[in-house]
Amino acid sequence: MDASTLFKKVKVKRVLGSLEQQIDDITTDSRTAREGSIFVASVGYTVDSHKFCQSVADQGCKLVVVNKEQSLSANVTQVVVPDTLRVASILAHTLFDYPSHQLVTFGVTGTNGKTSIATMIHLIQRKLQKNSAYLGTNGFQINETKTKGANTTPETVSLTKKIKEAVDAGAESMTLEVSSHGLVLGRLRGVEFDVAIFSNLTQDHLDFHGTMEAYGHAKSLLFSQLGEDLSKEKYVVLNNDDSFSEYLRTVTPYEVFSYGIDEEAQFMAENIQESLQGVSFDFVTPFGTYQVKSPYVGKFNISNIMAAMIAVWSKGTSLETIIKAVENLEPVEGRLEVLDPSLPIDLIIDYAHTADGMNKLIDAVQPFVKQKLIFLVGMAGERDLTKTPEMGRVACRADYVIFTPDNPANDDPKMLTAELAKGATHQNYIEFDDRAEGIKHAIDIAEPGDTVVLASKGREPYQIMPGHIKVPHRDDLIGLEAAYKKFGGGPVGQ
């Protein structure tokens, strides 16, 4: 596309150079800039990428978007705008022909449950023989092909490229986990959502948002930014068991479908049966009651299942068809995942990293604990420490507790575990400043019949260490290796 055509959509302050050049790519990553691409510089939290403008020029890039004039070679065109990342979003969607308009787009937000609901929607679509894509905490996936991702919600240009990739691969729908950070930072500008889903709102990320009010407002942006065009078939799916849903109803003009277990809703779960092999329940709907069976464990996953089913149903698939698909869904990686059922202990990993998430996790497993419940939890570095003692208190619902760091970054691991220990309600706990050693200890003290829960990381494949260096780490592999060494079995797979 000709750059002059591309920039007709943008109000610019000044153009230094010529826009008469062909553009086939846009990037905010200086390492990928080249001839034919636009490099968009921005001022980030730790890096101002304007300093890389000459480097991208040396790589052949002839057009940069900046917030103030740079000292560059004369053959490099500079487009000066007030908000470079907002412009990046407009340019990306224009250049790639508004890819989110070309498929059904589901957006899932909430403190807990985003990954599970989004993955369930994707897996249901696949069981229905529909081409589907997923983007979120567990990476990027088109049908069964997976790639890793850095953030739950990538920056705006990368996000647009992922949607374009899904469209080019023939995806009929795409499900995105929508983080509060991504909403506030404008990473989702220009994405046309067809269905917006809310799971819950509990304390988290106050290091970024400051207050629960600001955090809630951030989540609400997904719904308020659906637009006002009532000729479009857009829908909202809300959890009536969370009171924040009442507010979300007021910020969107589109039809709302509610679900709940404890509070009255249009879609409800009754006669719930739970085991470590899954759940079953009566799905009470405006159209009748259906029996639902699922391999997912825990009452909270019933809420997630209902949200996913309603979202897919809202776009035209019958409930009967969806319910059949749900019976045979694969596990959501790292979410109440039972590792190797042949072991004499129940070894479980989960991503729960808030007090609310931990409470729900313990509620789910406690009825099936045959002997002791051993619970390991970590606290992340450079995060909101006001939630930490409450996490320690909840962890002490278990018989024995292990406190570790989780992505300590530049914080002292001993300080993080001490903050968790402040909430301890009994003395049956131990602190480890090395998470891997904490996991090995959990297995070492476990006896046949015990349940060992490794919480807060799921299958996250790294630890963030000082200098924000990512060091390879897998709770599941460390736990399994220790369990096989003690009890026999294996080998550990990748």
Curated annotation (Swiss-Prot):
Q: Which BP terms does GO give this entry?
A: cell division; cell wall organization; peptidoglycan biosynthetic process; regulation of cell shape
Query: Is Cell division included in the keywords of this UniProt record?
Result: yes
Quick one: where is this thing mainly located? cytoplasm
Which Gene Ontology terms of cellular component type are present? Answer: cytoplasm
Residue numbers binding UDP-N-acetyl-alpha-D-muramoyl-L-alanyl-D-glutamate: S30, T152, T153, S179, R187
Q: Which reactions appear under catalytic activity for this entry? A: UDP-N-acetyl-alpha-D-muramoyl-L-alanyl-D-glutamate + L-lysine + ATP = UDP-N-acetyl-alpha-D-muramoyl-L-alanyl-gamma-D-glutamyl-L-lysine + ADP + phosphate + H(+)
As one GO molecular function, the record gives: UDP-N-acetylmuramoyl-L-alanyl-D-glutamate-L-lysine ligase activity
Q: How is it modified after translation?
A: Carboxylation is probably crucial for Mg(2+) binding and, consequently, for the gamma-phosphate positioning of ATP.
Q: Which UniProt keywords apply?
A: ATP-binding, Cell cycle, Cell division, Cell shape, Cell wall biogenesis/degradation, Cytoplasm, Ligase, Nucleotide-binding, Peptidoglycan synthesis
Q: Where does ATP bind?
A: G110, T111, N112, G113, K114, T115, S116
Enzyme superclass (EC): ligase
Q: Does the keyword Transferase apply?
A: no
State one Pfam family annotation. Answer: Mur_ligase_M
Where the record places motif L-lysine recognition motif is 406-409
What is the residue range of the signal peptide feature? none
Sites of N6-carboxylysine modification = K219
Where does this polypeptide localize? Cytoplasm
InterPro entries from the xrefs? Answer: Mur-like_cat_sf (IPR036565), Mur_ligase_C (IPR004101), Mur_ligase_C_dom_sf (IPR036615), Mur_ligase_cen (IPR013221), MurE/MurF_N (IPR035911), UDP-N-AcMur-Glu-dNH2Pim_ligase (IPR005761)
Query: To which pathway does this protein belong?
Result: Cell wall biogenesis; peptidoglycan biosynthesis
Q: What is its EC number?
A: 6.3.2.7
The UniProt similarity line reads: Belongs to the MurCDEF family. MurE subfamily.
What does this gene product do? Catalyzes the addition of L-lysine to the nucleotide precursor UDP-N-acetylmuramoyl-L-alanyl-D-glutamate (UMAG) in the biosynthesis of bacterial cell-wall peptidoglycan.
Supply the name of the protein. Answer: UDP-N-acetylmuramoyl-L-alanyl-D-glutamate--L-lysine ligase
